[in-house]
């Protein structure tokens, strides 16, 4: 392969120029993440590991541990140049530099030459994710990994138009499980819909997105993991498999490239590295990593949890309290103390059933997303939802950007608005639109109008009517 790329699993891609590995993205070589919940769908081969080790450049999209996998980075030679998006807070830059790597922050929308025929551009965004654009010869590869577009759709569409459609590729997440799914009612009964009810819509949305961007090829990426903790294996049926994509893909003019493939950008041909897409289920354990669900918090430890929640002034407008259930002991932490006089049925809150060690690690390091994505924690919703406020505010703005107060949030918003005003409005309008559609679905179901409205909406966006 003179010029091309290969997919190694999850979000790791390796780009080649003249048969030489030039760039590896989000290297996760072995081990687990999310408190031992996720493992690689299949272990890397020695050749795949060697390709990552030989690449001169490493690009890290964001701070989630399946992308920024510290144990994997520690295995790489320190002569690498690590490229990073221009994220709001320098924590990732500083931590990787402290490991001994040379670190370069890629300015927004500026090309960086990596080899004679390969150059790259990075688009950081307010979700604290990063999108990588790689030009290799006369081909263009957009690595969305698991980032939302965040107002970059217009820019990417105009960029992709400059290339032969057959030579444009978008590598993207296609998954429903890479976020909190483990919702329960007050009796502890899981309330998430069956997998088949959720998978189709996700696959349709990805197909629609790739088509709208104008790309000719979809590369399945950032989705190849398996749940291996005893208390998270229940989520494995919710993983979107390649068979699911084959069954429900709705844009036949967009070529699908399955996981674990090598793509020759000179010819456009690709070949599979494995005869099947079988997951390495032998990695599944009967253990819960470092957690003991019966362990309780001490008084000092409860105080640490309380102080962690109190840091988030940005939550006050949207939530009254958070409940934590640890070792069968339930405690309420008030976000709005003035709400104590309200009737319970009017309060807005979220309850988390969570083991001690993972909770304390989350409180110490501040990355609440990790405990949500692991899907071993159970979540109760009381007149509240995780989106559009809780997860973005506590996990993205708080954990990644270190934005906790309303004034800090205003400064944060100004940064992204000034850089791309139109994209900023488009992205925020899309979020309000999604919230509005959720209300429409809720009311249409109660008024008996769900079916006709669904038919109209799906015809408007070009999805199947089923």
Language-model region placement:
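Catalytic core of the metallo-beta-lactamase
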Residues: 8-19, 112-166
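Pre-active-site segment of Zn-dependent metallo-hydrolases
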Residues: 20-63, 70-75, 149-165, 342-343, ...
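Active-site neighborhood of phospho(di)ester-bond hydrolases with catalytic His/Asp-centered motifs
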Residues: 24-26, 54-68, 83-86, 142-147, ...
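Active-site-proximal loop/helix segment associated with metal-binding centers of metalloenzymes
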Residues: 27-32, 37, 123-138, 147, ...
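Active-site HxH/HxHxD metal-binding segment of metal-dependent hydrolases
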Residues: 44-110
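Metallo-beta-lactamase
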Residues: 84-139, 247
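Cap/insert and terminal regions of metallo-dependent hydrolase folds
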Residues: 155-250
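Feature captures hydrophobic
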Residues: 263-466
């Amino acid at each position: 392969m003179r010029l091309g790329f290969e997919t190694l699993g999850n979000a790791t891609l390796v780009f080649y120029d003249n048969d030489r590995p030039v760039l590896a993205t989000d290297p996760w070589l072995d081990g687990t993440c999310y408190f031992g919940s996720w493992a690689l769908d299949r272990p890397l081969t020695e050749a795949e590991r060697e390709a990552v080790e030989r690449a001169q450049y490493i690009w890290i999209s964001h701070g989630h541990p399946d992308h920024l996998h510290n144990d994997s980075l520690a295995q790489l030679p320190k002569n690498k140049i690590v490229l990073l998006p221009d994220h709001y807070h320098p924590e990732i830059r500083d931590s990787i530099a402290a490991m001994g790597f040379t670190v370069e922050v890629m300015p927004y929308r500026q090309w960086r030459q990596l080899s004679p025929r390969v150059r790259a551009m990075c688009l950081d965004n307010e979700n604290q994710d990063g999108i990588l654009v790689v030009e290799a010869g006369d081909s263009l590869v957009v690595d969305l990994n698991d980032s939302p577009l965040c107002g970059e759709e217009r820019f990417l569409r105009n960029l992709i138009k400059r290339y032969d459609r057959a030579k444009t590729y978008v590598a993207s997440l296609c998954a429903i499980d890479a976020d909190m799914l483990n919702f329960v009612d007050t009796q502890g009964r899981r309330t998430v819909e069956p997998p088949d009810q959720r998978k189709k819509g996700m696959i349709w949305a990805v197909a629609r997105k790739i088509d709208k961007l104008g790309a000719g090829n979809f590369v399945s990426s950032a989705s190849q993991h398996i749940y291996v903790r005893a208390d998270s294996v229940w989520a494995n049926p919710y993983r979107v498999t390649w068979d699911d994509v084959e069954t429900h893909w709705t844009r036949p003019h967009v070529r699908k490239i399955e996981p674990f493939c090598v793509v020759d950008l000179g010819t456009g041909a690709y070949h599979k590295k494995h005869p099947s897409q079988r997951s390495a289920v032998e990695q599944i354990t009967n253990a819960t990593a470092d957690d003991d669900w019966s362990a309780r918090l001490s008084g000092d430890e409860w105080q640490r949890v309380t102080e962690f929640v109190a840091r988030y002034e940005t939550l006050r407008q949207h939530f009254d309290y958070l409940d934590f259930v640890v070792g069968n002991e339930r405690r309420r932490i008030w976000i709005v103390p003035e709400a104590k006089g309200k009737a319970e049925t009017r309060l807005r809150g979220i309850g988390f059933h969570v083991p001690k060690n993972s909770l304390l690690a989350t409180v110490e390091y501040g990355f609440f997303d990790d405990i949500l994505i692991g899907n071993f924690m159970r979540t109760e919703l009381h007149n509240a939802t995780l989106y559009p406020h809780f997860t973005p505010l506590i996990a993205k703005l708080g954990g990644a950007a270190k934005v906790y107060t309303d004034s800090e949030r205003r400064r944060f918003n100004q940064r992204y608005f000034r850089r791309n005003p139109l994209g900023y409005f488009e992205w925020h309008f899309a979020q309000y639109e999604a919230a509005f559609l959720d209300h429409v679905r809720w009311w249409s179901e109660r008024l008996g109008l769900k079916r006709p409205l669904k038919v109209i909406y799906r015809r408007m966006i070009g999805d199947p009517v089923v």
